[in-house]
UniProtKB/Swiss-Prot annotation:
The lineage of its organism: Bacteria, Pseudomonadati, Campylobacterota, Epsilonproteobacteria, Campylobacterales. GO terms for molecular function: acetate kinase activity; ATP binding; magnesium ion binding. It comes from Helicobacter hepaticus (strain ATCC 51449 / 3B1). It catalyses: acetate + ATP = acetyl phosphate + ADP. Keywords: ATP-binding, Cytoplasm, Kinase, Magnesium, Metal-binding, Nucleotide-binding, Transferase. Mg(2+). Can also accept Mn(2+). This is Acetate kinase.
């Protein structure tokens, strides 16, 4: 069964066509700079042959048209016609309390996704655009929504409740939701497979470390806590996001810098994190170069990032009353061996010892703790698209033709 996976951003559209019988990727790519000058479609087929098409993409409609044309192209395409696509799986960032699992898309589902747009104003409207365009172009093809927030809906109330008036939750649904759920689900499951553990009788901490970063505690296959909150701004120090801070800072800075709330939130989302601390970059490769060159703020940014990760790992060990494995994933987690090393060396209290040689491995599955370590530490490259394809297949398989 061929599943087209769509991940629609505000100015980009990532896609993969996956044969779910073999779980092989038949084609993948990205439409970049949608609505901006310099639009481009980058495409790769199953043989790994790459192609690029520069053409104006004023909107997502044009982008999806170009994707469908590329997939059915006689020279470089993956399928002979659009009829070969059995279903479409859409990544949707925020499902609020409406969705605890992936669902078949219908008008009610679309209405609920719209209701959650205030909680994810940068993401949900873009996700909806992708759904709308696919509905126009392939009206008879079933579509499934897979939510970033769904995996975290198993958190108990004491984990997701904020210390604010309860009426805020009742009236406005102010609570912790968490994000990157599809990644946390895949990596936690894959970690137990990789280590030969029982997923439903295990305690796993997943560190999804990228430009956006989050940590989750997964006990017996259920998420019991996660670092991101109502929005993806809470938790770890990230590439450009501040993570946890004292809310009173907003009023304090508002008065002293003469900024309104929206301006401050823009700074906290786009100009903070390791970029804000270092003044150099949000990219950890640039930070490493600057640190090695003697830049003290770049060094501080890396230390602060690693320290926050360590704190959360320690807290989640307490939340689960122990841990079997800690796994790193996403761009930084999979490739930044120096950051991993900084974190793992502070987990000695768990009986963890870093295997320096194994830690040199980047971008592939590995155990980076020594054989004597009581808790295993792994690198597990994430595969959110595969989870979306699997969920889509499972739901569509239940439909009657």
């Amino acid at each position: 069964m061929n599943i087209l996976v769509i991940n629609c951003g505000s100015s980009s559209l990532k896609f993969q066509l996956i044969d779910t019988d073999t779980e092989k990727v038949l084609a993948n790519g990205i439409c970049d700079r949608i609505g901006i000058e310099g639009s481009v479609l980058q495409y790769k087929n199953k043989e790994g042959k790459k192609s690029e098409k520069k053409e104006a993409m004023p909107n997502h409609t044009k982008a999806i048209e170009m994707v469908l044309e590329a997939l059915t192209n006689k020279q470089n395409g993956a399928i002979s016609s659009l009829d070969d696509i059995r279903a479409i799986g859409h990544r949707v960032v925020h499902g609020g309390e409406f969705f605890k699992e992936s669902v078949l898309i219908n008008d009610t589902v679309i209405a609920h996704i719209k209701e959650c747009s205030d909680l994810a104003p940068l993401h949900n409207p873009a996700n909806l655009m992708g759904i709308d365009v696919c509905k126009q172009k392939m009206p008879n093809t079933p579509m499934v929504a897979v939510f970033d927030t769904a995996f975290h809906q198993s958190m108990p109330p004491q984990a997701y409740t904020y210390g604010v008036p309860y009426e805020w939750y009742e009236k406005h649904k102010v609570r912790r939701y968490g994000f990157h759920g599809t990644s946390h689900k895949y990596v936690s499951q894959r970690t137990t497979e990789f280590l030969g553990l029982d997923y439903h009788n295990s305690k796993i901490i997943v560190c999804h470390l990228g430009n956006g970063s989050s940590i989750s505690a997964i006990k017996n296959g259920k998420c019991v806590d996660t670092s991101m909150g109502l929005t993806p701004l809470e938790g770890l120090i990230m590439g450009t996001r501040c993570g946890d801070l004292d809310p009173a800072i907003l009023e304090y800075i508002s008065k002293r810098e003469d900024l309104d709330i929206q301006s401050i939130l823009n700074v906290l989302n786009k100009k903070s994190g390791v970029l804000g601390i270092s003044g150099v970059s949000s990219d950890f490769r640039d930070l490493l170069d600057a640190d090695l060159g003697g830049n003290e703020r770049a060094k501080l940014a890396r230390l602060a990032f690693a320290y926050r990760v360590m704190k959360y790992v320690g807290a989640y060990c307490a939340a689960m009353n122990g841990v079997d494995a800690v796994s790193f994933c996403a761009g930084v987690g999979e490739n930044a061996k120096f950051i991993r090393g900084m974190i793992v060396k502070h987990l000695e209290f768990l009986g963890v010892e870093l295997d320096e040689e194994a830690n040199n491995i980047c971008g592939q599955e590995a155990i980076i703790s020594t054989a004597n370590s009581k808790v295993k530490v792994c690198v597990i490259p994430t595969n959110e698209e595969l989870v979306i394809a699997r969920d889509t297949r499972a739901i569509v398989s239940q439909l009657k033709d």
